Amino acid sequence: MKSDFVEVCILGKTVGLKGALKLHDRSDFPNQFKNGAKFYDINSKEFVIKSYDRNNNLVIFENYDSIDLAKTLVNYILYRSINDTIRDCKLAKDEFFYFDIIGCNVFEDKILLGEVIDILEVGAGFLFSIKTEGDLVKAGLNSNFYIPYNDNFTQNIDIKSKKIQVKNSLDILKNS
């Protein structure tokens, strides 16, 4: 899958005889699942939603409106283009897409700590997984560590410059 796509759901078992599939939403934007919305598999094959039951998370795709056809899609992972995601998924103030955060450099004061390589959901919060900057690794610090995404650690996120300013995080790295 090209890097301009983001994973949004996994298709589960079939339900009923008309081609409905259980949709397991892996995004924070359930409103993107609507009639006519386009999604893609790992090979860039397009799937268009014919109908979506939001209450039961059941989806039927165009040209897959029988149980036999739908069974061929069980366990498929579907993706959405980043452009469609940005257009259709509205963010509140101080909210960001994962794909905007991943790849950002993390600084405490003027010290480059590393780069965000993943975001983990833990309980009610999030952790930035950081690949430690090379010189810090050479100095004996761990090659990876985690920073909680909350006001005690994250001061500023600047998506345009791909920089995250943090505090109290060098101590986390030193004690990892």
From Swiss-Prot:
Q: One of this protein's GO BP terms? A: rRNA processing
Task: Name the UniProt key words of this record, in alphabetical order.
Answer: Chaperone, Cytoplasm, Ribosome biogenesis, rRNA processing
In terms of superkingdom, the source organism counts as: Bacteria
Report the main location listed first in the record. Answer: cytoplasm
What family classification does the UniProt entry report for this protein?
Belongs to the RimM family.
Can you say where in the cell this protein is located?
Answer: Cytoplasm
- Domain remarks in the Swiss-Prot or TrEMBL record: The PRC barrel domain binds ribosomal protein uS19.
One MF term in the entry's GO annotations: ribosome binding
UniProt protein name: Ribosome maturation factor RimM
A Gene Ontology cellular-component term: cytoplasm
Report the protein's function.
An accessory protein needed during the final step in the assembly of 30S ribosomal subunit, possibly for assembly of the head region. Essential for efficient processing of 16S rRNA. May be needed both before and after RbfA during the maturation of 16S rRNA. It has affinity for free ribosomal 30S subunits but not for 70S ribosomes.
Do the record's keywords include Chaperone?
Answer: yes
InterPro entries reported for this sequence: PRC_barrel-like_sf, PRC_RimM, RimM, RimM_N, RimM_N_sf, Transl_B-barrel_sf
Record's subunit section: Binds ribosomal protein uS19.
Q: Which residues form the PRC barrel domain?
A: 93-172
The keyword Glycoprotein is assigned to this record: no
